[in-house]
Amino acid sequence: MKDIFYMKKAIKLAKKGSLTTSPNPNVGCIIVNNNIIVGSGWHKKTGMKHAEIYALKTSGEKAKGATAYITLEPCSHFGKTPPCCVALTKYGISRVVIATLDPNPKVSGNGVKWLKKHGILVTIGTLSKESIKINKGFFQRMTTGIPWIKLKLASSIDGRTALNNGKSKWITSDKARHDVQHVREKSDAIISSSETILFDNPLLTVRNTNNNDNNQKLLKHSKTFLKQPIRVIIDSKNRITPSHKCIKQPGLLFLIRIHSDNNIWPSHIKQIILNNKSKKIDLIDLVKMLAKYQINNILIEAGPSLSSSFLKLNIINELIIYIAPKILGNYAKPLFFLENYSNLSDVPQFKFEKITQIGKDLKLILTKHNSS
Amino acid sequence: MKDIFYMKKAIKLAKKGSLTTSPNPNVGCIIVNNNIIVGSGWHKKTGMKHAEIYALKTSGEKAKGATAYITLEPCSHFGKTPPCCVALTKYGISRVVIATLDPNPKVSGNGVKWLKKHGILVTIGTLSKESIKINKGFFQRMTTGIPWIKLKLASSIDGRTALNNGKSKWITSDKARHDVQHVREKSDAIISSSETILFDNPLLTVRNTNNNDNNQKLLKHSKTFLKQPIRVIIDSKNRITPSHKCIKQPGLLFLIRIHSDNNIWPSHIKQIILNNKSKKIDLIDLVKMLAKYQINNILIEAGPSLSSSFLKLNIINELIIYIAPKILGNYAKPLFFLENYSNLSDVPQFKFEKITQIGKDLKLILTKHNSS
């Protein structure tokens, strides 16, 4: 019970890094000596100290004989920082409680082995689900090579995204559209299509989220920590030009193409050629490539064609649908273009995860039918 | 503050009649003498005593000099029961607090006038909104001549009601379908179409709701109180025959037609001829006719054609949509057949009133955009 109590606190601490640690996971650490919390820390940003180091430094002498509660297995290899396992022994920690092992198959279990070898008592699995939940993208990328993929949509209650004449501004309310900024800021990359750019000419950046109380708290240590997601535009026909708003907007942008062109592109634009036999951009290749760029969380913001292509591949982990209390009718544009199913058992299934009212609209979060 | 406190109790009592009082409204009454509740009552069923009479009888002598809290203006005319106003004075009540006036324009205000004339102090308007809310159908029928109209639908998250081949069994889960029984039992009439009867051959009755705890409580005084809603089938082409399941099933059923036929119908079937110049059944005429049958609450359970016709008339007070976490795609059948709108400002708008999860599905209750 005590272990759960302190691990909950460590997870709460870990969440403070939710907007800033990626590609690293969120990690929190609490050091407890004789039922007194003597130190705590959390990981802020890649290249900065790990949670354990902050916690040990605040504990000082009091770490001797204490228990460390860590939301993720401590590292035992020299990366950008010296290994946390060494620090834990150096400070005299006698027991380590770990929520879950490191999912990186190259290092998973090594920290535990190291600690045990150095006479430290190790408990594994306390609130493991919760710890994995706050690092879904990191865990999925490490274990499958594919980032966590969210698909964002906005529709009427009868599942329509635009009128027959294309008008869709605006089906949902200001508040719902502002909420999208918060979904974006939790993403490492936003995938969109050249169709969306040609039609809407969006910036695809995170804007005006600093006035949010929670973000103020998360970012108060340094506003510069909030990073813009990488914008990824699928442009197989080279239709995007240097004059589009998203191109002029600073911030890394990947143009995913089959062939490069001879335009002069700003330095923050990177043409990535994804060619294969089919002469089409393979979306699985794309998300695997993004995983290699250490992208944990992808947000898809596109029209029904690209959204449907991802849906058919069965790689959407989360659907985020903003629903306005309007009815657009049968002439309006559908949410998805799918096949003509013969049986209800064949259709894509999800499960409702979280329902909130955002202003006049509903925000539905659904997860893959079989994902936990 | 005390008035609100006691009126809340009276409204809670009134709700006990929610499945049984129609066509009468739900009414509760609390009698308070010197800060002590000395009597209480609620209306159970048309023809039975009014709430005030029960409350006065339980108070007896203690009603003298007491305050009566009544959720609706007491009657002053001799109807099926002697007027409550007379009883209130006879028992020596000195003050009456009324949530709201009787909406029936023929009698509204008469009770208050009578009480004042007999030296009783009258306060009007305590929790009036709450009192109207528990009698929405009654108030709307009395003030507009049109019952409260609910439209029930079931769809996928992309707003589809069936696959292209017509398969719709079942999009939603058992639990959601069972919940529909509770929606039916709160209705005085269910409107459906001959299309639905020919395709699904449903009974359109309330079934298996007595195992519900709340209903057990509501009905414990007498199970016979739960009445079946009147089934109303729009059958302009005389396609329903005596062999359909809903016809064989006992319980009043109105066949709404343009011409009668020569079939021999069971005595619980009533052919109602609604003819007009257009040779079509006018849905406004239909609901006004049902209001004359003292129908307070109508539930529409039909396919997209009839549902859309009601929607276009702008007389739907409440939309009840069960949404399954499935995606049926663009080939599947739409929720509504409407016009090809040119502007988003022209589309039907509602507002989300209540969202609940029923098993795997969502139940959305929406109300008319401008209704309170």
Curated annotation (Swiss-Prot), chains A, B:
Residues 1-122 form the CMP/dCMP-type deaminase domain. Residues 1-145 are annotated as: Deaminase. The active site is at 52 (proton donor). Its cofactor is Zn(2+). NADP(+) binds at residues 154, 170, 196, 200, 236, 303-309. Binds 1 zinc ion. Pathway: Cofactor biosynthesis; riboflavin biosynthesis; 5-amino-6-(D-ribitylamino)uracil from GTP: step 2/4; Cofactor biosynthesis; riboflavin biosynthesis; 5-amino-6-(D-ribitylamino)uracil from GTP: step 3/4. Keywords: Hydrolase, Metal-binding, Multifunctional enzyme, NADP, Oxidoreductase, Riboflavin biosynthesis, Zinc. In the N-terminal section; belongs to the cytidine and deoxycytidylate deaminase family. In the C-terminal section; belongs to the HTP reductase family. This is Riboflavin biosynthesis protein RibD. It comes from Buchnera aphidicola subsp. Baizongia pistaciae (strain Bp). The lineage of its organism: Bacteria, Pseudomonadati, Pseudomonadota, Gammaproteobacteria, Enterobacterales. The gene is ribD.
